[in-house]
Amino acid sequence: MASPPDTDGFSDVRKVGYLRKPKSMHKRFFVLRAASEAGGPARLEYYENEKKWRHKSSAPKRSIPLESCFNINKRADSKNKHLVALYTRDEHFAIAADSEAEQDSWYQALLQLHNRAKAHHDGAGGGCGGSCSGSSGVGEAGEDLSYDTGPGPAFKEVWQVILKPKGLGQTKNLIGIYRLCLTSKTISFVKLNSEAAAVVLQLMNIRRCGHSENFFFIEVGRSAVTGPGEFWMQVDDSVVAQNMHETILEAMRAMSDEFRPRTKSQSSSSCSNPISVPLRRHHLNNPPPSQVGLTRRSRTESITATSPASMVGGKPGSFRVRASSDGEGTMSRPASVDGSPVSPSTNRTHAHRHRGSSRLHPPLNHSRSIPMPSSRCSPSATSPVSLSSSSTSGHGSTSDCLFPRRSSASVSGSPSDGGFISSDEYGSSPCDFRSSFRSVTPDSLGHTPPARGEEELSNYICMGGKGASTLTAPNGHYILSRGGNGHRYIPGATMGTSPALTGDEAAGAADLDNRFRKRTHSAGTSPTISHQKTPSQSSVVSIEEYTEMMPAAYPPGGGSGGRLPGYRHSAFVPTHSYPEEGLEMHHLERRGGHHRPDSSNLHTDDGYMPMSPGVAPVPSNRKGNGDYMPMSPKSVSAPQQIINPIRRHPQRVDPNGYMMMSPSGSCSPDIGGGSCSSSSISAAPSGSSYGKPWTNGVGGHHTHALPHAKPPVESGGGKLLPCTGDYMNMSPVGDSNTSSPSECYYGPEDPQHKPVLSYYSLPRSFKHTQRPGEPEEGARHQHLRLSSSSGRLRYTATAEDSSSSTSSDSLGGGYCGARPESSVTHPHHHALQPHLPRKVDTAAQTNSRLARPTRLSLGDPKASTLPRVREQQQQQQQQQQSSLHPPEPKSPGEYVNIEFGSGQPGYLAGPATSRSSPSVRCLPQLHPAPREETGSEEYMNMDLGPGRRATWQESGGVELGRVGPAPPGAASICRPTRSVPNSRGDYMTMQIGCPRQSYVDTSPVAPVSYADMRTGIAAEKVSLPRTTGAAPPPSSTASASASVTPQGAAEQAAHSSLLGGPQGPGGMSAFTRVNLSPNHNQSAKVIRADTQGCRRRHSSETFSAPTRAANTVSFGAGAAGGGSGGGSEDVKRHSSASFENVWLRPGDLGGASKESAPGCGAAGGLEKSLNYIDLDLVKDVKQHPQDCPSQQQSLPPPPPHQPLGSNEGSSPRRSSEDLSTYASINFQKQPEDRQ
């Protein structure tokens, strides 16, 4: 517009021109006048047209004194893109320009005059000074609010809105026309015609804002003066609403940027200031709420205007670029450094970028150090988080810190920091403090000090089959394999090798730790610290306490892989809370494959106390393996095995690697003492190392204790062979078949490994702590457990880890697995066997026991367990006897095998090719040590089914001769002495209610130490030849026949089949017949023929009543008595056998029974003799009690060497053998009878 004429009337005119009125769009002639003495104050006037103005024909249509305006802004709406709005106390006046240039020229002129007017007005009584120069004001958004004369400070933006009666508008009575006035830090609602703001909200209190069409809303949080809620307002149109939204967001972002740097105290330069970089709420300085909101919002939008404060400071650079968004890597946060809307982003981008990059990446690389705030000094600082907030400084460092997201949480950040916890981004556990501590670096929590390689992040427990179980560091820290690497986190190791560890162990531990410990929680803190249970630490602690779940054990020999013995002890008992933890021990023991006999190392108490009622803690001789006590009442679930069920390592885990969980069955991890676990044969003593956790360390205790090396499961070079059998069958029936994965047992790979049967896992007598005399291992080998409830037999031959851990599994894997060769007598095979791998591999596993998995628990889960106390006694005796013979595994015959079908060919060792007889035949070779080979089955089968042929007649070397049908009453228990390798079947079958086919010895060679007891029918026909040398006459019962002779005899027996062996058929029945007389609880009890002390079994519940006892010599008694005649009933229950052996009276059994009783003595010889009796009495015990007695009565006398009742059997040797002879039938109801 042309300059106003230079006439007196126009001397004060600054600008004139045609502009439009926004609503009507009519053009009007506007005149901007400056203040003058003649004309008055500065004002904006408009006329209908220029002619009227020039001729002064009329007064202006309207005149607006600029000093009355509290704000002048540029605006735009749906109709007009170029508006200039003037807000006065009572109205809003706008003019529309045709172009942006025109708009800007008018805007600048108005601002200049407005500023002067305000200055004059301030001088007079002053309003807001014109501190803000027009230029400065323009700089920001072109709208400097510095000119305001209005009711408050200058406003960056002012919108006239109508507050709606909704949300806070209603509750706070803020309804009607208001001016929404925006400053760099606040939003104010000023009511029309009012000079005072009704409400002033901090931008930082705004949670969010938005618009919908011509409505705009703001949501504020609790910190707002109004309290939480929303303000809804209506504006002219959606364009205005959108403009409000964008402008407020910008202000929030700007404030956020500005505020952050301030809050950070520009420590960009000083790393020392670790300002927590929390996502700031930005409350600190009440940064403009906008910032807060901005924080939430992407900061992509560049700020239009620099916040005046920053501008005023004139240090645009000072503003901190750091944006939380920076952390996000968005450079977008635009604080305008120079005030130009764009520039901020630019500057900031650079600073941020360089800083951010380091931040982003370094955290990834950073060592775990949780940098202290100070540490984070340089943006590039390695500290991942550089948490220390310091980074704020103007550049990126802050962002780095702030941006925990990238890194794991920044430690330095205050908890409030948003990033603080987010640290986990990298995968540190989500909430874990420790992860946040992990310093940003995802992996490093406390690694920093050790700063282990990422490889270490392995605080996770390894669930993989191969991982070793967790180790406990001597310091008590648990070594956990985390991250599935199977690596253990060894806090102590991390911190430094625990002194307790031997050098190599320590090295191994360190190595282990290094390799695996990716995420140790220690933030470079000492292990102690790591383990402190701080909130963050708690997770760590829990980790420590966490047990490794990996089924497979670490390769014991595997360098670091080997357990550190020191860990075993770790003070951190909880670590071992898990039975599996115990498993660790053998690894520890065998660090690097070298066995660490040191019980101290290996046997640190696990801190686990067995709670199971029936279980007696395993003797200390378990060497700390017994620290773990199973809590299950009768059956132990064998987490150990489960956890490290097999220390499979290269070798296959014993099929027993799984522990039967069936409530009724206790797992029958008869692993011979975890021989597998023993790192080497030499470690054999620790052979049960595996079992350690289970069974109160049953496996473990023998492992170490066993004098003779049992065949360590570890097949190779001190590597633990997986000793399995810790798996407990949970199936209601207790069917061990579940364990069928004979693969475990039979793992072709290493038959060598004796599976550590669940036996070790067993908490209680299952394990039969080794008897004093007996090598723990050997004893185990000798024992077969019968669990009436579990329906599993426990073959604990240590040597034969494969003892059926789960009833069938162990059996199948182990006993049946006995290969025919096992028929061959191997005296002391057990002892010799130690080197043989426990693994029950197909035939390969000499140790294999019955292959057939079938075992039914007799229905009482508890029945399965025999009193542990007895068992312990038994173990003690066994140990004593073990000197005589490698004790058979002390498996209490807690499992009852029930076969319904006839014609089952005996329980064959699953993989084992031999199985002389179809019935289970433990190869005679299943010597105490080589139990696997020893044929005696120690298992008594009770067949419900008709025509079950007990193939028990496997005679060890000699065919028992197919036993003709035993006398109807006779339940023949032919159990080759354990010592007699040949004795094949230590399996006694009891058929109830079905005519039993005479047991035919399937394999001529192996006498089946299998006694058939049929309750309902005459198993009667089954008789095992008694004669040791001669083929046993069919009628001759296999009473547990262990040679009466001392060990030599036992050995003989072992060599010869129990029944068919040189010992003669009599040798077969190491097992006493069970008298099922109605007066006695007929319910199926586990009857365990205990071949002499070798395997003392106390039948926790014996069939025979005391009355029977008279006839019967308890094996234990015989064993204990060493020579004491077995005739006395008293003896029957005495602990000597460490279990009650109930021998049927000869009267009950008939002549045979007598022989059977003598068999007891023989049992020593026959230690292999039937250790297990399976009674299918559960169903019809009551019904057929008569039969049982008859059977028992009819049972042929045991061969001379037969343990039953024979005075010989009483001999100490016999006692050792007695262990094998264990007769116990547990029924559910009564404690004794378990009826």
Curated annotation (Swiss-Prot):
GRB2-binding, as annotated region: 895-897
InterPro entries, A to Z: IRS, IRS_PTB, PH-like_dom_sf, PH_domain
Start-end of Gly residues biased regions: 1118-1128
Phosphothreonine modified-residue sites: T441, T448, T502
Motif (YXXM motif 8): 987-990
Biased composition (Polar residues): 522-539, 1072-1084, 1101-1114, 1204-1229
MF terms in GO: insulin receptor binding; insulin-like growth factor receptor binding; phosphatidylinositol 3-kinase activator activity; phosphatidylinositol 3-kinase binding; phosphotyrosine residue binding; protein domain specific binding; protein kinase binding; protein kinase C binding
Residue window of motif YXXM motif 2: 546-549
Stretches assigned to the PH domain: 12-115
In-chain residues carrying the UniProt-annotated modification Phosphotyrosine: Y460, Y608, Y628, Y658, Y895, Y939, Y987, Y1172, Y1222
Domain IRS-type PTB, residue spans: 155-259
Chain ranges for the short sequence motif YXXM motif 4 as given in the UniProt record: 628-631
List of residues that carry Phosphoserine: 3, 99, 265, 302, 307, 318, 325, 340, 343, 414, 522, 612, 632, 789, 891, 1099-1100
Reported modifications of this chain: Serine phosphorylation of IRS1 is a mechanism for insulin resistance. Ser-307 phosphorylation inhibits insulin action through disruption of IRS1 interaction with the insulin receptor, and Ser-789 phosphorylation is increased in the liver of insulin-resistant rats. Phosphorylation of Tyr-895 is required for GRB2-binding. Phosphorylated by ALK. Phosphorylated at Ser-265, Ser-302, Ser-632 and Ser-1100 by RPS6KB1; phosphorylation induces accelerated degradation of IRS1. Phosphorylated on tyrosine residues in response to insulin. Ubiquitinated by the Cul7-RING(FBXW8) complex in a mTOR-dependent manner, leading to its degradation: the Cul7-RING(FBXW8) complex recognizes and binds IRS1 previously phosphorylated by S6 kinase (RPS6KB1 or RPS6KB2). Ubiquitinated by TRAF4 through 'Lys-29' linkage; this ubiquitination regulates the interaction of IRS1 with IGFR and IRS1 tyrosine phosphorylation upon IGF1 stimulation.
Region (Mediates interaction with PHIP): 3-133
Location of this chain's protein in the cell: Cytoplasm; Nucleus
Identification of the protein by name: Insulin receptor substrate 1
